[in-house]
Amino acid sequence: MTAPSQVLKIRRPDDWHLHLRDGDMLKTVVPYTSEIYGRAIVMPNLAPPVTTVEAAVAYRQRILDTVPAGHDFTPLMTCYLTDSLDPNELERGFNEGVFTAAKLYPANATTNSSHGVTSVDAIMPVLERMEKIGMPLLVHGEVTHADIDIFDREARFIESVMEPLRQRLTALKVVFEHITTKDAADYVRDGNERLAATITPQHLMFNRNHMLVGGVRPHLYCLPILKRNIHQQALRELVASGFNRVFLGTDSAPHARHRKESSCGCAGCFNAPTALGSYATVFEEMNALQHFEAFCSVNGPQFYGLPVNDTFIELVREEQQVAESIALTDDTLVPFLAGETVRWSVKQ
């Protein structure tokens, strides 16, 4: 990696956790990812969710149809696990190169997850098949019992779901997505080579004070929710250490402004336009820019068993102001860090 003080040249990154939605929203947001990233793991929580090979093929084509000319971008599709999913369908999709991974949403944990899994036991035949064929499991790691505090749901998931699952299926490859706690950072660091994690820019840059002190900031509201500063610091220390089983996953999750700024707002940060520069800022603050390229462009492909990208991009260190909003057909999108001045941005 070449790192003069004002320019960072890195191998083209990938986004290992991304929501692109569908319809007009899809057309609006895809270019913000496809101009920067070579590949992205695309989340399957549409309505209805992507649970068949045919649905994934059709969705992949809708994505590709929106990629601007000149962008070299490959969407990596995922299967939404449900209690009734046929293991043979999953294996067929994996063998045919349609499904790269499968996603476990605990029922009602996040946006469009009402079809999610009610218990791990309900999908054990599917998970056993995934272990057998080497298909990665992507996990939204929160329990959803009504009596468990929202700030405790990730830590409780580790002890009640994740660890028993990994003890039972020892060869299963697992990505603990968008980790937000010291508990999860320690768990992944102490795990073996079959356990990895993604971290979002918002969980590295902010904690719950930023979202709640001096007024509620709905555009920082995402799930898993921002935690206290000791957890934020643990995540920052994990990425700054150069640990090779943690990698870039923005969890960019667009919602129209009126669905965020409401009396019952949706969870999700649309960070695709600003994520890479945000990560660079964090690595610079942690004096860890020497590990930035691996986090963005190497660790993910290594875990998935895929080649790294063979092209490069540059980030420049110069102050730029983020747009206040982005036009949608009948509304607007508010990007992560809207209206703020950022230090790093992708060179156009």
Curated annotation (Swiss-Prot):
One Pfam family matching this protein: Amidohydro_1
Record EC number: 3.5.2.3
GO biological processes: 'de novo' pyrimidine nucleobase biosynthetic process; 'de novo' UMP biosynthetic process
Pathway(s) of this molecule: Pyrimidine metabolism; UMP biosynthesis via de novo pathway; (S)-dihydroorotate from bicarbonate: step 3/3
Active site: D251
Top EC group: hydrolase
Annotated positions binding Zn(2+) 2: K103, H140, H178
Subunit structure: Homodimer.
Function: Catalyzes the reversible cyclization of carbamoyl aspartate to dihydroorotate.
Family to which the UniProt record says this protein belongs: Belongs to the metallo-dependent hydrolases superfamily. DHOase family. Class II DHOase subfamily.
Protein name: Dihydroorotase
Organism: Escherichia coli O7:K1 (strain IAI39 / ExPEC)
Gene this protein is translated from: pyrC
